[in-house]
A protein has these predicted regions:
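C-terminal, flexible cofactor-proximal segment of oxidoreductases
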Residues: 318, 322-415
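Rossmann-like dinucleotide-binding core of oxidoreductases
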Residues: 154-209, 216, 227-229, 312-332, ...
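FAD-site-proximal beta/loop scaffold in flavoenzymes
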Residues: 120-153, 240-243, 247-318
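FAD-binding core/adjacent interface of flavoenzyme oxidoreductases
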Residues: 1-3, 73-161, 256
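A Rossmann-like FAD-binding core segment of flavoenzymes
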Residues: 75, 81-82, 178-282
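Central hydrophobic cores of alpha-helical transmembrane segments
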Residues: 559-570, 583-587
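Alpha-helical membrane-anchoring segments
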Residues: 403-541, 558-559, 571-579, 591-626
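Beta1-alpha1 glycine-rich phosphate/pyrophosphate-binding loop at the start
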Residues: 1-74, 160, 170-208, 256
Length: 626
């Protein structure tokens, strides 16, 4: 039995475990174990949204048991204190874990560069708990400031300093600038009293980006009334102040530290070669240069690719690209096949500044292009959803879309509040029942005609090569009359041609429809095939069934979408009048939960959702919503 242990449930650890589980899903001789001290995976790149109350607290946590449901990965909650490389064991206070192959992905922690008071008097910003603590600290300061009579104390309470103007610091200060507006309204504080500062020892913010994007970011931050302090010689952080230089001491109750990271605490204690703030040196296969059965993933990697002068960056894409290489190389070790070399090709960086603006430098290696505003935010959201699709599939992508686009408050989205305006579903009840009633009426009326003459085809137009033109025209008129209200159709058109052309159809769609009907419904002599009769009966029954579903509010979303599909089918044959537009518009309005009020969906969907999530295949493929 080969034992693979992955230490750390961060980006790299989770993706490596999933890749290994896929490779060894049918191999009973391989055991995969992931160890982390938390029961959840944290989306570190979204911490700023929780800290500034834009996203729910649980939106950046993903249950590890959910991620690995149905997969060959044993999740263990424990905190490892030592690794015995010679004995191939991981040790904690309560257990010992043996391994044949080890993947170290314990991530990073803040580094304070020996600055006096920095560690003791600042809020770190590198975990879920940090984000929640900062949100509470910010609210507490506004709560106290609203009651404070001393102007100097009030001013210090309403001064917030973020040390570090890299990606994390800039994204955080941008979110806090938007959060300021909300809190000022809530606590009746003039926004001009609130001071936001982002400071860095470097000569410019976001130094990894091109100067043009840096200027755009600075301009937007200043527009948000954020003070930018560069070349800040941070010498000390006191209990109520921070020194941003010899003559620039800022009184504040809140200093957030985002100025840099180093390897996690356990990495610093390991007997392995390290460089660059406690990063483990690896070879091209991402193995520790000291231990060939030990691999390194994510922020812990120190590896300089061929032709480069700098080590791979500590960013999510590095973890994403390293994970499949490590999984492939462990597989190669076990199977005795050649290993893969790590050849990363990064696709750029994206920075959001608040919920509505961002800058990005993205593309392919050697061919990058700059984005700002809407397009930069679109690219960032796309990359986030792509990552989530790898980790928890549809489930988390759906949740992400809800809190980023559809359930936002105060228009905090790059698409504004256009997709998040909500109204009570009970206003849709009359429309839903009317729409259902119309479809039932149409279906029952047509069913009577089928009952009278089962062989008469009136829902499918006559073949173009039918010999009796007059009969064809008559059938076309009958078809239109059966599709829409007969009296309205008669008053709206005078000939079959006019009726059929009531709603125009693009030529390529009409030609495709004709090709399909020639294949399925017409004989060479222009008469109908036996399928035509059954298709007609099926359409009529569908109109009745979906109409009833709408009336009683059962699976109203499915019924609404189905009626839209039927309307499109009718339209594609040039047999739909303008009345069909009403059917489609009403169905679109009824998709969004119209059956949850005075409908069976109110009872059925919660029960179905509860039992649906219990199906192993559903959980394995994340085909459910929370």
């Amino acid at each position: 039995m080969k034992k693979i242990v992955i230490l750390g449930g961060g980006y790299g650890g989770v993706l490596t475990a999933k890749k290994l589980a896929k490779k060894f899903k049918n191999n009973k001789e391989v055991e995969i174990k992931l160890i982390d001290r938390n029961p959840y995976h944290t989306l570190l790149t979204e911490l700023h949204e929780v800290a500034a109350n834009r996203a729910p607290e649980d939106s950046i946590k993903i249950d590890l048991k959910k991620i690995f449901a149905g997969l060959k990965v044993d999740v263990v909650l424990d905190e490892i204190s030592n690794i015995d490389f010679k004995g191939k064991k991981l040790q904690s206070e309560k257990a010992t874990y043996a391994y044949d192959y080890l993947v170290i992905g314990t991530g990073s922690k803040p580094t304070f560069f020996g600055i006096p008071g920095a560690e003791e008097n600042t809020l770190s910003f590198w975990s879920y708990d940090d984000a929640v603590a900062l949100k509470r600290q910010t609210r507490d300061m506004f709560t106290l400031a609203a009651k404070e009579k001393n102007a100097a104390v009030r001013r210090s309470m309403l001064t917030f300093v973020v040390v570090g103007a890299g990606f994390t610091g800039v994204e955080l200060i941008g979110e806090m600038a938007e959060y300021r507006e909300d809190l000022c309204k809530e606590f009746y504080i003039d926004p001009s009293e609130v001071r936001l500062i982002v400071a860095d020892m470097a000569p410019k913010i976001l130094p990894i980006l091109p100067d043009k994007l840096i200027q755009k970011a600075e301009s937007y931050l200043r527009k948000m009334n954020v003070e930018i302090v560069t070349n800040a010689k941070i010498t000390e952080v006191g209990k109520g102040s921070v020194a941003l230089g010899e003559k620039n001491v800022v009184d504040t109750h809140t200093v957030v530290w985002t100025a840099g990271v180093e390897g996690s605490e356990i990495v610093g204690t390991l007997d392995v070669q390290q460089q660059g703030r406690k990063r483990i040196v690896t070879n091209e296969h991402l193995e520790s240069v000291d231990h060939k059965n030990v691999y390194v993933v994510g922020d812990n990697i120190f590896f300089i690719p061929e032709g480069e002068t700098r080590p791979v960056p500590q960013m999510v894409e590095n973890a994403e690209q390293a994970a499949p290489v490590i999984a492939a190389n462990i597989t190669a070790d076990i199977n005795g096949t050649p290993k893969k070399a790590y050849k990363p090709g990064f696709h750029g960086t994206m920075v959001s500044i608040g919920s509505r603006y961002g800058v990005a430098n993205v593309g392919l290696p050697g061919k990058f292009f700059m984005l700002t505003g809407f397009m930069a935010m679109l690219s960032k959201h796309f990359i986030n959803m792509f990552y989530l699709s790898q980790v928890v599939g549809f489930n988390k992508v759906w949740t992400y879309m809800m809190h980023e686009f559809f359930h936002v408050e105060n228009r905090k989205s790059f698409v504004g509040g256009y997709f998040s305006k909500r109204s009570p579903n009970f206003w849709l009840v009359p429309l839903r029942m009317l729409l259902g009633g119309m479809w039932v009426y149409e279906g029952v009326d047509k069913l009577k005609k089928i009952w009278e003459d089962p062989d008469k085809i009136f829902l499918i137009p006559a073949a173009p090569n039918a010999t009796d033109a007059a009969s064809a025209a008559s059938q076309a008129v009958d078809a239109v009359k059966e599709t829409v209200d007969a009296q309205s159709a008669a008053s709206a058109v005078t000939t079959a041609k006019e009726a059929v052309e009531a709603l125009p159809v693009p030529g390529f769609i009409y030609d495709t429809t004709n090709w399909f009907m020639d294949l399925m419904f017409y004989n060479p002599d222009g008469t109908y095939t036996f399928l035509a009769k059954w298709f007609q009966l099926g359409m009529v029954c569908a109109e009745i069934v979906f109409g009833i579903m709408l009336i009683v509010g059962l699976f109203s979303a499915i019924a609404s979408i189905a009626t839209i599909g039927m309307a499109v089918m009718i339209w594609s044959t040039k047999m739909a009048s303008t009345e069909m537009l009403w059917y489609v518009a009403a169905a679109i309005a009824c998709i969004g939960g119209s059956g949850s009020v005075f409908g069976l969906d109110y009872y059925v969907l919660p029960w179905l959702k509860k039992h649906w999530k219990k199906i192993p295949l559903v959980r394995r493929w994340y085909l459910y919503t929370d």
